[in-house]
A protein has these predicted regions:
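Short glycine-rich phosphate-binding loop at a beta-alpha junction
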Residues: 25-36
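Nucleic-acid-processing active sites and adjacent nucleic-acid-binding tracks
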Residues: 1-27
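Long, charge-rich intrinsically disordered scaffolds of nucleic-acid metabolism proteins
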Residues: 45, 52-168, 172
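Phosphate-backbone recognition surface of nucleic-acid-processing proteins
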Residues: 11, 183-261, 265
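Short alpha-helical scaffolding segments that buttress acidic/His motifs in well-ordered protein cores
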Residues: 101, 169, 183, 232-237, ...
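Short Gly/Thr/Asp-enriched flexible loops that form oxyanion-binding sites at enzyme active sites
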Residues: 38-45
């Protein structure tokens, strides 16, 4: 197997694309590397190349089963072998609006976390020595968040598809503007007919995995997934199960039924999260708003 190494810059990207076209490679298998792969994936997609971004958990399990040492060359071989044996198909889709929305929303999440930390520091500022500095930073962060909100709204207003998604999501009880933007930013698969509700639950990390063997039935568990949309759904369900928000009767009924059947309360909460996600997914697919 031939091994080549390219720099992660414009020149390296051009060399890689040239080699791919010369060898008529059908699909490129890529491992997520914390965003370092984003630029080359975009360029490959713009050059009409088929790209598959592997699931890190699945690939790591496959990689460990091969019992090979850890080098760049071996890692490249593992990716190629994994793609061949698993018969992977393209799953990478680049859309300018979705990517822009995701970056703005991610930056907003970072600033909100910083703002929360600064408010805690202000609360514990006993003698007020650092109070003025903290208050200045809090005001700056609030202005930056407001500016990002404007940019997020501009991106959504420029796309009819995103506007429709946000409108449908906001019609669902408990899904306000903030949560709706989080879902469409970090879960672009939402409403896509190529994804079932179970697959979407697995992507978010709220799908139950069995652990059975013979006559033994182990406890189901959840793992992995995208943290920001999962956290957003969790907070909405916590409010809904207590009847805090109007229109949440269907979730409260599900929660009460599971708890009355002696299911652990956290199991009932996760089940409600899946139900809420399924409702959002189906409504966007059918292009209709929630009706109480």
């Amino acid at each position: 197997m031939e091994y080549n190494r390219f720099s992660n810059d414009k020149l390296g990207h051009e060399e890689l694309i040239k080699l791919i076209k010369e060898q008529e490679i059908k699909i490129i298998v890529c491992e997520p590397t914390g965003g370092y792969e984003s630029e080359i994936c975009q360029e490959l997609y713009n050059n009409k190349q088929q790209i598959h971004k592997v699931n890190t958990y699945s690939f790591n399990s496959f990689s460990q089963s091969m019992n090979l040492c850890k080098t760049d060359k071996k890692d490249a071989f593992k990716l190629a072998y994994y793609g061949d044996k698993m018969q992977l198909t393209a799953n990478y889709l680049y859309q300018v609006e979705s990517e822009t929305l995701k970056r703005y929303q991610q930056r907003r999440e970072d600033l909100v976390l910083m703002l929360s930390n600064e408010k805690k520091r202000l609360h514990h500022s006993i003698d007020g020595i650092d109070k003025e500095s903290i208050e200045k930073l809090i005001k700056f962060l609030q202005n930056e968040i407001a500016e990002l909100d404007k940019k997020l709204n501009e991106v959504i207003d420029e796309s009819e598809e995103l506007k429709e998604k946000v409108k449908i999501l906001e019609s669902v009880p408990g899904i306000g503007k903030c949560v709706g933007k989080k879902l469409i930013s970090f879960l672009p698969e939402l409403g896509n007919k190529n994804y079932s509700s179970n697959e979407l639950s697995a992507i978010v990390g709220i799908a139950p995995y069995a652990r059975d063997s013979g006559n033994k039935q182990g406890r189901r568990f959840i793992r992995g997934g995208r943290k920001i949309p999962r956290d957003a759904l969790y907070m909405e369900v916590l409010a809904g199960k207590n009847g805090v928000k109007n229109g949440f009767q269907y979730l409260k009924a599900l929660y009460d039924r599971l708890v009355n059947n002696y299911k652990p309360k956290k199991v009932a909460v996760v089940a409600c999260m899946r139900k809420l996600l399924e409702v959002c997914h189906k409504l966007i697919q059918q292009k209709r708003c929630f009706v109480i």
